[in-house]
């Protein structure tokens, strides 16, 4: 028995270090898994790697690894796997932080698939959730982006405002600029329909400023006063500290609305009828102006019956502050050469050379601008090979050059250009342009070589996908069927477009030219234009040409008040009767026209 004890003790001493060694070996080969993961970070491993780790865990840690796998799958654009992970996570008990990350990942996946509305429905954080600041920031940023992509600028601004508590001071100027960009992009109708909660004082202020700019844009002095008053009354609003540049520009304007205005137009002679129409439009707008100072004086002078020297004497005697006109190019040049006191001028034509050092701007119904806009319109419609068809002569060449230059600017390629002469030559010209004549000549040549008549049909060009025609309605009536006949069966016909020259207003020709899209002033493309009924009642027998001149006169009056803003505010736009007006570097008014389709009712 005595000999048994030492043996037992030695075995015990031997087993202890072996067990310890095995334990240490086990610890070194299988490191302890972390209690939690930082699931707010971007994934650093593949989705499959995270799934393998998740399968070895349970509870919250398993969910963490699955969420990281989900984020990795979305990053890899493996959406089938992402859907399976969503299904698996949906059966688990998730914390608010985990639910938030799952929503963010799901929304990002839907965003990448252009499912913006579904993505927004997915993002629905609860206000009571205790989350990391980074999660709230990502939530509001993502919702902002989704609202923008959905065209909902008001709600995009709401999300930006929610980011304010998380934004560093040196980044707040950028944040409020983004808010203003979203709110100020709302059109008149959208601003009128805005409904805000009483607690949304911040957003209410931005909407108020945008509304002032929209509703008072034609009354610069009132707008300036209103903006000043608002900023003084709301010193704690972000707009008072981070004032939008457009508002600063308006506040800096030295607005002096001229009280003595002269209208220089030909009221007799060759250009008398045009001058009278412009005059009527100008006075019409003046009478409609509720903001007009009762002391404003208008002096109308006939440039055909009065010498320019006499006119200058009258202007000085009457203390004229602003001149609208003349209408004729030579008279404009003569006025500018004698305008030693530099009276501000809005000329109603464009001289051959523009002197940017004098106090003059220019506004006219420019056919060259219309040609340039036609090029832009066709380009935006996706056409690649347009044909520009214009009448022979100086005008046709001038307009085709304007179209060609703009098309080259947009595409680095020149369009096809062709000119037509008399109506009797129209069909021959169309056949020539579309290659029918050359194709017919090749058929004759083949018949001669074969000494027999072969069965063959002339083939038309296939590359022309759009035709823009500078033509009267009477010419368009012939051009349309000639083009349709020239195109071989089975070939997609080119889309037909026309200038305002085609819009004569003659109802009898609408059937023949139905379907052709044309450009013109809004007053003639939109039957429901707010001023159309009133105009038709006052001038019921007006031709479309006379209506355009009347609209020119009305817009000229409005420009007298708005030119200071147009000069000071970048990208300023004015909705006029002749189109959307803006100003270029040479102080020439640029006119964006409207489009309509012959024979179709407008909205």
UniProtKB/Swiss-Prot annotation:
Q: Does the keyword Signal apply?
A: yes
**Signal peptide positions on this chain:** 1-26
Q: How does it sit in the membrane?
A: Lipid-anchor
Q: Name one Pfam family in it.
A: LppC
Coiled coil location: none
Q: Name one GO biological process term.
A: regulation of cell shape
The terms under GO molecular function for this entry are: enzyme regulator activity
Lipidation, kind S-diacylglycerol cysteine: residue numbers? 27
Q: What does this protein do?
A: Regulator of peptidoglycan synthesis that is essential for the function of penicillin-binding protein 1A (PBP1a).
Name of this protein: Penicillin-binding protein activator LpoA
Its source organism is Aliivibrio fischeri (strain ATCC 700601 / ES114)
